[in-house]
A protein has these predicted regions:
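A conserved structural/catalytic subdomain of Rossmann-like adenosyl-cofactor enzymes
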Residues: 2-176
């Protein structure tokens, strides 16, 4: 099944040890499977989740899709951006995404936006139908100062985006 749009907030730092045999068998399928670009460390399945989403993108080159591709917005912690040395599974997955020119933007959000954790999070925008002015580029948006304090904390969630903050971030993205 292919999708036009996908939105996700997978759990942060979830290990995939219980699915290890299945994942490694799928990896052996190469790019005919979902995990051909590589396998991340076993203690964080975020990039497996993203590879699964990428495998569900419509191919704009296929006649039946009439030039339509797909767009993905996914919220991650910093792990998919920063972990893994050169040549590691994480590094190979990121390289595969960038070499295919699918990563459109990364938006750094304020900390303390989630109930169970105060960590910084990032929205990755992924597309296989980039606008001409975005081809070969990745937009980095620092939205870490775009927040307001909540009247009452909810666990570790102390900050929130107002409508004005969302508009500002959207303008930064749109005016690229």
């Amino acid at each position: 099944k292919q999708c036009d749009y996908m939105f996700a907030n997978p759990p942060f730092g979830v290990e995939w040890k219980n699915q290890e045999n299945f994942v490694k068998n799928e990896y052996k399928s190469g790019f005919n499977g979902r995990f051909g670009a590589g396998l991340p460390r076993i203690n964080d399945g975020s990039l497996l989740f993203l590879q699964t989403m990428i495998s569900k993108m419509q191919d704009p080159a296929k006649e039946e899709n009439k030039g339509r591709g797909s767009r993905i917005a996914v919220v991650f912690n910093g792990s998919p951006l920063f972990t893994g040395d050169a040549g590691s599974g994480e590094s190979n997955i990121r390289r595969w995404i960038i070499e295919n020119d699918w990563l459109e933007a990364v938006i750094a959000l304020p900390d303390q936006m989630f109930y169970n954790t105060g960590i910084y999070t990032y929205i990755w925008l992924v597309s296989n139908q980039k606008a001409e002015n975005r081809k070969g580029k990745v937009q980095l948006i620092d939205a870490t100062s775009h927040y307001q304090k909540m009247a009452k904390s909810l666990g570790n969630k102390r900050n929130e985006l107002s409508e004005a903050h969302i508009e500002d971030i959207t303008k930064l993205y749109s005016n690229f």
